Amino acid sequence: KFVNITGGEPFVRRDLEDIVEVMFKKSDRIVISTSGWHTDRIIKMAEKFPNIGIRVSIEGLSQKNDDLRGREGSFDRAMRLLLTLKEMGVKDIGYGCTVSNKNSEDMLWLYKLSRELGMEFATAAFHNSYYFHKDDNEITNKDEVIGNFHKLIEELLKDNSPKSWYRAFFNLGLINYIRGNPRMLPCEAGTANFFIEPYGDVFPCNGLEERYWNLPRCQPHRYPPPPHLGPSALCRGPPAGSRRSGGC
């Protein structure tokens, strides 16, 4: 039903248009997550596929974003891209912020900016992932970050849109995660969604080491399945109709 093409940076691939063309034959909605740096390639993609979704990663206002992303001018470039896509008539556009120790206050301003621009805004908390070889991410100024998430939730609940209310609940889940508590909703990785990496290995999500299928070989890996998938996960193949990455 939904495909999210992510990275790294998807737009460094020269065959990305071919991938999108194939995916649109399989799914009604394709969204590409990007830093927004390769503006010419992104605009070209939107011209060819007007129904494409674009989500740009923005980690704060101008200086904060550029510092965290390590590229001077990346905030301005991302904003110009989003405004250009909006002028082109692309509907499925927005940006997201991964909240860390350094940018939770800017998250609130980014939300307000999204309201003014009429664009989607999403949040995440930075975390560790086997797939990306990261194990030292930890939010240490928890009171400050949680306080800013509470402010965001209050703003979302003022909106008349049920979608904003669901996002408020999602952000409540992020607060729960930051506090180190068990997740509020069951993990559906490997059942309602899964992650395919460039070499064809299929993971329940990109946060787990266990992979359970390889598309080119069309055979299961003989690794123990993640506990919540049960012993039959290796023999049933990828869940039908699920193509988006996600998970814990």
Positions of the model-derived regions?
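Conserved SAM/AdoMet-binding glycine-rich loop
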Residues: K1-G60
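Cysteine-centered iron-sulfur cluster-binding motifs in ferredoxin-type domains/subunits
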Residues: E9, T191, S245
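Solvent-exposed, flexible loop/coil residues
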Residues: D15, E72, N103, T191, ...
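Radical SAM enzyme [4Fe-4S]-AdoMet core and its adjacent flexible, acidic
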Residues: E21-V22, K26-D28, K48, I52-E59, ...
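Short, surface-exposed loop and linker segments with low hydrophobicity and enrichment for Pro/Ser/Thr
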Residues: I32-W37, N160-W165, R243-G246
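Flexible mid-to-C-terminal extensions adjoining Fe-S/redox cofactors in radical SAM and related proteins
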Residues: P182-M184, D201-C248
